[in-house]
UniProtKB/Swiss-Prot annotation:
Protein name as annotated: Uridylate kinase
Organism encoding this protein: Lactobacillus johnsonii (strain CNCM I-12250 / La1 / NCC 533)
Signal peptide location: none
Pathway field: Pyrimidine metabolism; CTP biosynthesis via de novo pathway; UDP from UMP (UMPK route): step 1/1
Broad class of the protein's primary localization: cytoplasm
Gene: pyrH
Upper classification of the organism: Bacteria, Bacillati, Bacillota, Bacilli, Lactobacillales
Spans annotated as Involved in allosteric activation by GTP: 20-25
Length: 241
């Protein structure tokens, strides 16, 4: 553990990252790759909490824009995050990594209800904990869930695992060839520069609790381990103002 910079982490995995190139659904090969990457960090003794998005299956905001009641649409999105979490649990356990899924909406037949003290105990015992169901409340994103769970379990960092994006840029590098990649930012920089890394609620929660973020490309093998060891491969967003 002496070479590890972050000993307890929240890994935020977008739903799109689990879909791979298809863009929708769950790609078993992506799950297998991600599970192997997580296992390599788990083998180093790092305590790992994971928050999955659900955008590969459903987005509450999209449903609301199509005329659905927003709360109902958001609940559907929460269920999508749980499906992703169960898929990732299966991938991890196939590699021998002890894993627990905790959901903010009770469904005891398939997962534990979220209990903070129990989650921390799982981490201390070397189990990976996957947090499903978002915050359990509509109108809150899974980015906010990641910030909330990070604060609750006293995580050292939130790792924002992006699908093919290796950091935060001043503009979309696919559109603007002059886009500048930032190596380090503050939470206030995100707001003042209007950089869409996470929503304002999640950003404020991270800033208020002094939790740093690292935005990096999860598709490149070894990147999760590199970030945990402190290598500068993405963009670090300092937790303070």
């Amino acid at each position: 553990m002496s070479q590890v910079k972050y000993k307890r982490i929240i890994l935020k995995v977008s739903g799109e990252a689990l879909a791979g190139e298809k863009g929708t659904g769950i790609n078993p090969e992506v799950i297998k790759h991600l599970a192997e990457e997580i296992k390599s960090v788990h083998d180093m003794g790092v305590e790992i909490g994971i928050v999955c998005g659900g955008g590969n299956m459903w987005r509450g905001e999209t449903g609301a824009n199509l005329g659905m009641e927003r709360a109902q649409a958001d609940y559907m999105g929460m269920l999508a995050t749980i499906m992703n979490g169960l898929a990732l649990q299966d991938g991890l356990e196939n590699l021998g990594v002890p894993t627990r899924v905790q959901t903010s909406i009770e469904m005891r037949q398939i997962a534990e209800p979220y209990i903070r003290r129990k989650a921390v105990r799982h981490l201390e015992k070397g189990r990976v904990v996957i947090f499903g169901g978002g915050t359990g409340n509509p109108y809150f994103s899974t980015d906010t869930t990641a910030a909330l769970r990070a604060a609750e379990i006293n995580a050292d960092v939130i790792l924002m695992a992006k699908n093919g994006v290796d950091g935060v840029y001043s503009a979309d590098p696919k559109v603007d060839p002059n886009a500048k990649k930032y190596s380090e930012l503050t939470q206030l920089d995100l707001i003042s520069k209007n950089l869409k890394v996470m929503d304002s609620t999640a950003s404020s929660l991270s800033m208020d609790n002094n939790i740093p973020l690292v935005v990096f490309n999860v598709n490149k093998p070894g990147n999760i381990k590199k970030v945990v060891m402190g290598e500068n491969i993405g963009t670090v967003i300092k937790g303070d103002k």
